[in-house]
Amino acid sequence: GKITDPAVGLASFRGVMIGLVCGGVMTFAVLALGLGGATVSLQPRGFFFYALNSASPVLSTLLFFLNVALLEELGYRFFAGTWLLERTGRRWVAIVLPAIVYGLTHTRLDFLPVAEPWWGRALVLTLVGCVWGWAFLRFGALAVVLSHWTADLFIFNWPRLAADDSMIVTAAALTVAVPAIPALVAAIAAGIRRARGRRTPPLESA
């Protein structure tokens, strides 16, 4: 639908809220593992650092991680989750199995929390994958893609958010906020429609 479509705005709002839930789940899991001696790290390296070091980090991270969010959510949730639900009829299977695979496939990214042990990283991302799996079945693909996009933008813009330059920090914060634009636009459009409705005089009966 159009960006002013209330359904799109609602998906955007839900995506941001789901992203906050994922952040809370990740934080709790990382802190719990940290108390057990796990090593925590969050510093993009290798291929994932290229976007931050490009001529236009804002555009590069927006486009690159939108592609990542689309591919991963289509693969893990839309295709695998839907297929498992149709085959088993069990929602928990459609949520948990793709989440486990999602967590395991991210173990090589040792800059994600937690750095060590490797299974801690798999556990954290499996929990996040379960949130996205539940959200996909509850709210649909668009909300989950926007949530995933928001999460990746935050994680991989972290070095810029922690910079000493206020302009860089502002640009990074605005980049992370981009998935919330449909929610803002839809809210403004709804406000305009309500204002116009109040100004329209009632039709006089003949």
Whereabouts are the PLM-identified features?
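Interfacial transmembrane-helix boundary/kink motif in multi-pass membrane proteins
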Residues: 1-27
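Membrane-interfacial, low-structure loops and terminal tails that flank and connect transmembrane helices
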Residues: 1-11, 84, 194-206
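Transmembrane helix-loop-helix hairpins at the membrane interface
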Residues: 23-42, 46-202
